[in-house]
Amino acid sequence: MCGRMAITLPHEAMTQMFDAVPDNDLPPVPNYNVCPTVPIHTVTSSAGTRRLRPMRWGFIPHWYKKPNGGPLLINARSETIAEKPAFRDACRNRRCLIPTTGFYEWRRVEGETPEPWWVTRSDGAPMVFAGIWQNWEMGDDRLTTCAIVTTDANAAMAPIHHRLPLILTPDQWPLWLGEAGKGASQIMKSAPEDALLFQRVTTEVNSNRATGAQLIAPISS
């Protein structure tokens, strides 16, 4: 799964990268410890216009009576996303991009403190995850929510965790956003093994309250 990430890109850079119109209420950057249930940056496309907009990280199905009315759905498995009642309509009709600098994952060994790793693209470019989104309404409450699509881990990721966010390249963005017709299922594949860089980082990030650039600074193994 992907349960923590960081975003250091300025809003202007994101706007230019996606050729998107930015909302006025985007989350502040940089944020070196982005956690579930907070607003994150997303990109959607409608009628030929891309929009950079905030969404709550944590997909809320329409039948939830309240935001915490069931399991916290921060990820959606690519293998079952088109079949699960919570996700299937969003998979067909409401797909988004989720820009990040990288994400954290923990290698867990029984009896030991979880070991945090910082994962980025090996070429230094920003990461862009595939996402799905949903408007949730109950009475006067309204939230726009999202989840990150995941795949099986590639061989490089597998020693740390068995899942990996679905990482999209720029040529895949139009297809995922529905701008280039159908066939998005064809790009739901694990990233190539050489596409990712893995670095050990401080256990400070084990706390969801930790902040600061030191969280992504590599340490000796």
Label every PLM stretch briefly.
Residues M1-S221:
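Short linear sequence motif anchored by a di-proline
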